[in-house]
Swiss-Prot record:
UniProt name for this protein: D-arabinose dehydrogenase [NAD(P)+] heavy chain
Taxonomic source organism: Saccharomyces cerevisiae (strain ATCC 204508 / S288c)
Keyword check for DNA-binding: no
Annotated substrate binding sites: 131
Other facts noted in the record for this chain: Present with 30200 molecules/cell in log phase SD medium.
Gene Ontology molecular-function annotations: aldose reductase (NADPH) activity; D-arabinose 1-dehydrogenase (NAD+) activity; D-arabinose 1-dehydrogenase (NADP+) activity; D-arabinose 1-dehydrogenase [NAD(P)+] activity; diacetyl reductase ((S)-acetoin forming) (NAD+) activity
Biological process, per Gene Ontology: acetoin metabolic process; carbohydrate metabolic process
Task of the protein: Catalyzes the oxidation of D-arabinose, L-xylose, L-fucose and L-galactose in the presence of NADP(+).
Amino acid sequence: MSSSVASTENIVENMLHPKTTEIYFSLNNGVRIPALGLGTANPHEKLAETKQAVKAAIKAGYRHIDTAWAYETEPFVGEAIKELLEDGSIKREDLFITTKVWPVLWDEVDRSLNESLKALGLEYVDLLLQHWPLCFEKIKDPKGISGLVKTPVDDSGKTMYAADGDYLETYKQLEKIYLDPNDHRVRAIGVSNFSIEYLERLIKECRVKPTVNQVETHPHLPQMELRKFCFMHDILLTAYSPLGSHGAPNLKIPLVKKLAEKYNVTGNDLLISYHIRQGTIVIPRSLNPVRISSSIEFASLTKDELQELNDFGEKYPVRFIDEPFAAILPEFTGNGPNLDNLKY
């Protein structure tokens, strides 16, 4: 088992039956990040429900909220934070807020960040990520986010990529903001959906190593090679879609059910603990206040149990988030999940 697991053991052994909301990791620049966060990539028809979900999460002990320019949930996240700050429930310095730069603004990171800060009603974010290593063409749309088509496609339905785009330009602009001693809008920078190949180029050509690589990972997609690479380079993984996207299919995995019963926790708790136990940040998404507040029990999985879960995923891999625009990236197909590998 990797030493990332061992380092996590040192944390939890010093705590008596810890809640997952009480566990923190350190980024490679020294900033502390809560191991558990609330994801807010919510369905468009339920965007407004994000506000109550965020309030419920913070009241339950969550201190990490993950959002993005592209989610259109930033205003609702901001409203929730504003109300909780005003009533004294929380202090800004106790929160960790992550947002992201979408590929349509690949060469306008400053604009993206400012729009996110305005929507959130904040002076800074704790972590700014490059959402995808992609560059989209800018197509105007008065009804779109910031007057742009979020993911432009041509008449045949193919994604329109910027002809002159280089995904590293986005990261270099993040880097410039982060390195400016007079710019205090971000405390850390990182990436999302980067493969080993893309990370290798970034590390070679850029000055600041990403603190985080946010990717889809769970027992159906353990990402072991990527996990090892990131650990070797002091980059933390953040797991999105830990339950397996819509319908939470990973809760149906027999081994998950078995281990949840053994540790007397919910399936949600088990899947969250699976990540934290391996030194991975995890950001489950939910709009259900009861589920949010009840999914904070830590299951101290053994190394053998972690290995068993990872072996299952190596044998039956399923990537649930595989959008058409990602088809040009390594390890993506753009064709959606391979449901034949779902094993219940």
